[in-house]
UniProtKB/Swiss-Prot annotation:
Protein name as it appears in the record: Membrane protein UL43 homolog
Residue spans crossing the bilayer: 48-68, 71-91, 103-123, 126-146, 162-182, 188-208, 266-286, 299-319, 339-359, 386-406
Family according to the record: Belongs to the alphaherpesvirinae HHV-1 UL43 family.
Keyword Transmembrane helix: yes
Domain of life according to the entry: Viruses
UniProt KW keywords: Membrane, Transmembrane, Transmembrane helix
Source species: Varicella-zoster virus (strain Dumas)
Pfam families: Herpes_UL43 (PF05072)
Lipid bilayer topology: Multi-pass membrane protein
Gene Ontology CC annotations of this record: membrane; viral tegument
UniProt subcellular location: Membrane
Amino acid sequence: MAVNGERAVHDENLGVLDRELIRAQSIQGCVGNPQECNSCAITSASRLFLVGLQASVITSGLILQYHVCEAAVNATIMGLIVVSGLWPTSVKFLRTLAKLGRCLQTVVVLGFAVLWAVGCPISRDLPFVELLGISISAITGTVAAVHIHYYNFVTTFNGPHIYFYVMMLGTGLGGLLTVILYMYVSKYEVLIGLCISIVTLVSIVDAATDLQDTCIYRKNRHKQLNTYTDLGFAVVYTQNDRGRVCDHRESSRTLKRVFKGIRIMSVIPPVLYIVTPLMWAISHIIKLNHFIKLTQVTLAVSIGGHIIAFGLQGFAVLYQEKKNLWVIVLYTTTSVTGIAVTFAGISWGAIIILTSTVAAGLTCIQMMRLSVKPIDCFMASHITKVYHVCVYIIINLCYLCGTYVS
């Protein structure tokens, strides 16, 4: 009895120590237990909501660029956004870029609000100097917003499943609702007011850092990696066949090792990201899509791609062993079909390809997260964050192709 009593006291003390180690440092009322902590639950919900709103800011920036920049400039900036996100960086650097981005996007949106208030038209018809200044401001705001999302994405990708899936759903809804408002709200006063409010909300709070500080996030990292360290600093120790102890740091994993076994699935999104705008442009050059209303079609395709991706994700979880195979077969087949239909002179080929690309990009991101080891998640998130942004960039590029080519 004495031994059991001592063991119970030891377990209780261990639990107290765990609570202290995972207790949030900046969230008042945190009790150090995810199942009992209402403060961290409320913080998580509010910060994930802001993560979704950040996608609305990115979409607004892309719409603004469309109105003030030429197609070549738009395409170039989108390419730079992608390239700037490919290089793996430390969490500290991501946080610094996000902090700078929040300041820049606030300054940009307030500047455009002042221009609108004084009656300055925002279009390509302005004198060169004024147009150049407005274009640079629009580009700066968009790039800043994307780098905030990069930090948000890396944070949620390495967090609990619920954080990741809410982020994926929230960013999709944020972008789609912004396009819907742009299409159907005729009063610019309403749009500008919403834009200022949203940018202010997402800029005054560091959503990603707050999410990392919740006891929910800290407990999940301890469960996955057996560590209480912050994101990017985990070290996992293993023993090889020779009995030698090896340390694996999440910040220094190689991409070759991270994507071992899922190489084909990691290649599908970038291939489709390259092929899709080309097919969309070709279909407009040969006048296959002359009857299509571009804004409505790209919106419908975006919604359809998201529905397919999230619907099939549930199906994939039921069949874990063959998940990689069916993803590869499904999206390869639909993409090849779309290409064949396009060259056959049928008008809906490009739409099939774009829908497949949106769904494939989102699905592959989710499948890669399920496939990589916990220690590899941090490095994998640096690539998948670019895949995620590329989904929305490709939609925008296809819209530009249809606008300027037709």
